[in-house]
A protein has these predicted regions:
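Mg2+-dependent phosphoryl-transfer enzymes with acidic/Ser/Thr/Gly-rich catalytic loops
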Residues: 2, 9, 14, 34, ...
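Short, well-ordered alpha-helix to beta-strand connector turns
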Residues: 16, 48, 71, 78, ...
Length: 267
């Protein structure tokens, strides 16, 4: 089980200069971005802690995050791309050529639709048309959440799909099942993002991550300074590698709690 956030030594916490974070139900809570969360991101930025959202959210959502939020950049669609802003210029990096990414997505989309046809009432995510790479199935966003059994059944079927002979990945977040083709992941793209930003000189002790669900496990297994917001509790039995620490509060309020802890450690 994760330890309390207060068990993290202030000596170790004050070294953190990069905070990677999930978005839905980690920065947000019940579909809203709390004012406390936005203020926490701003305070972290002012203190020299670079915040990088790493999300399964669509490209359209990521564009406004990069433009409007006090963040260093954003990694979207579970690592398919990232966006940074430097000297008023936006830079996009894609894990595969953009045209190839869209071609594979179109092919995958038709296959996922065929799977969903056997489940009346199940739909794609409302933001599917704003996605570059993945296909998202709505399991809990603005609808009654699906049962654990049905989610597991869907994951099993979706993971059996192929795109031009290549297997697909499928992972569960708090609101969607995200399905994509390619070797990218939250972890691999976060590693590449950090290596690019630091010219390859990455110090694990300076990096932290916070998340809330199963699709954050690769990040928990990579980053030693890993934190779960309190609402990760129902997912803990599913995690072979849970976060090291956990906040007392849920979602964005838990993120603000983490931010205040990191800022206090630097005082």
């Amino acid at each position: 089980m994760p330890k309390l956030l207060t068990d993290w030594s202030s000596q170790a916490a004050k070294r953190v200069t990069w905070l990677f974070t999930d978005v839905d139900d980690t920065l947000t809570w019940r579909g809203k971005l709390p004012a406390e969360t936005l203020d926490a991101m701003q305070q972290l930025s002012l203190a020299g802690i670079n915040v990088v959202p790493v999300t399964g959210a669509c490209a359209g959502w990521c564009d406004q995050i990069a433009r409007l939020w006090p963040v260093h950049g954003v990694i979207g669609e579970n690592g398919a791309f990232w966006i940074t802003k430097r000297q008023q210029q936006f830079h996009h990096h894609y894990c595969v050529p953009f045209s190839e990414m869209r071609k594979r997505q179109r092919y995958l989309l038709e296959q996922v639709k065929q799977v969903l046809a056997s489940y009346p009432g199940l739909t794609l995510a409302n933001d599917q048309s704003f996605r570059f790479c993945d296909v998202a199935v709505n399991i809990a966003q603005d609808r009654t959440p699906l049962s654990v059994e049905l989610i597991e059944e869907l994951l099993l079927q979706l993971r059996q799909l192929t795109v031009f002979g290549d297997p697909v990945q499928a992972t569960e977040s708090s609101i969607h099942i995200n399905v994509w083709t390619g070797n990218h992941s939250k972890r691999s793209s976060s590693q590449s993002y950090l290596s690019q930003a630091l010219n390859g000189e990455v110090n694990q002790g300076e990096v932290a991550y916070v998340g809330d669900s199963c699709n954050d496990e690769p990040m928990f297994s990579w980053i030693n300074n890993s934190v779960g917001v309190n609402n990760i509790t129902p997912y803990l039995p599913k995690l072979a590698c849970p976060p090291q620490y956990m906040t007392r509060q849920n979602g964005g309020y838990g993120f603000a709690e983490l931010a205040h802890f990191l800022l206090s450690a630097k005082e």
